[in-house]
């Protein structure tokens, strides 16, 4: 699921030639996808919390297949392009990508091991990040965009079968269980939105969404703008996927040793450095490789500590739902990153302004994570 989502930026030239869409229209479709992904993450999270993650994820894959089918078979221009690539695939990702799978797996582990567990799930997504861009670039050249999208349906079929085996633990492994066992979802929601740390976490994850979607969507166009070949962007995306495996696993381990908010501060600061070096250096294959590796290590490394902080504060009973809301904030940032990248290019002929924003937002995220208090509600109520 995450691997396929990573490839859509590689389709832009084909969509431009075959469907006549502009960069702004393409960016808008990806932005809509991000918003619907975000809106449906807490909804599918609630389905997972109440009825099981397998049901939520399976439904998501069915919708994913419908979106891909409509995208290659038609109608797929104008508003229908926005519906297929934007709305349907966005809804599907709300169930199949990151928030629900990570949270469902996290429920099986105690707090001290939870970041490792979520890191493993995120690393699995990174395998898709590595393989999917390479496969897509090859398939687009050999078979064309319609056939490539048809091949995507086989991956979706595999994912839907695997999703049937996602089961919740028979008993929650949660120190907050005595407090949350009779708590309703709306009570948990009220607690979350009155917790300063939860609100700051939402603000920080907004930045993550802006950055990774800007890069995933517009790095092919950005590399073309800088006079680099199409394979440069593919290599960047593939390296991001490969080194994200190392980054998420490493962050999962570090989350058991150090304060999660401190790790997030460091991550966002390093993102600012990585982006700045990349855009202010002369374009070259070496810099493409350096950026792919460096940003890959930081790509989804934010997920284990972010998910871990939510679970640490509020417990795991409504983890899929509460983390889904944090992920909605992520997707609002993703919408803005996807849309502004295309908008700035069409208006000013350059992606530079969008990347300047990405650097500034990294500094903002570094600052807002520092005051987060990750003390659980068990402790707060006891005092």
Task: Give, region by region, the residue ranges found by the protein language model.
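Hydrophobic core of transmembrane alpha-helices in multi-pass small-molecule transporters
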Residues: 80-95, 287-301
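Intracellular juxtamembrane helix-capping segments at the cytosolic ends
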Residues: 95-109, 301-314
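Helix-loop-helix hairpin linking two adjacent transmembrane segments in secondary transporters
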Residues: 124-168
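Extracytoplasmic gate region of multi-pass secondary transporters
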Residues: 8-9, 197-238
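C-terminal transmembrane helical hairpin of 12-TM major facilitator-type secondary transporters
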Residues: 261-309
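Helix-to-loop junctions at the C-terminal end of transmembrane segments
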Residues: 41-52, 249-259
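C-terminal ends and interior cores of transmembrane alpha-helices
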Residues: 63-76, 271-282
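Conserved small/polar residues in nucleotide/adenosyl-binding loops
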Residues: 378-383
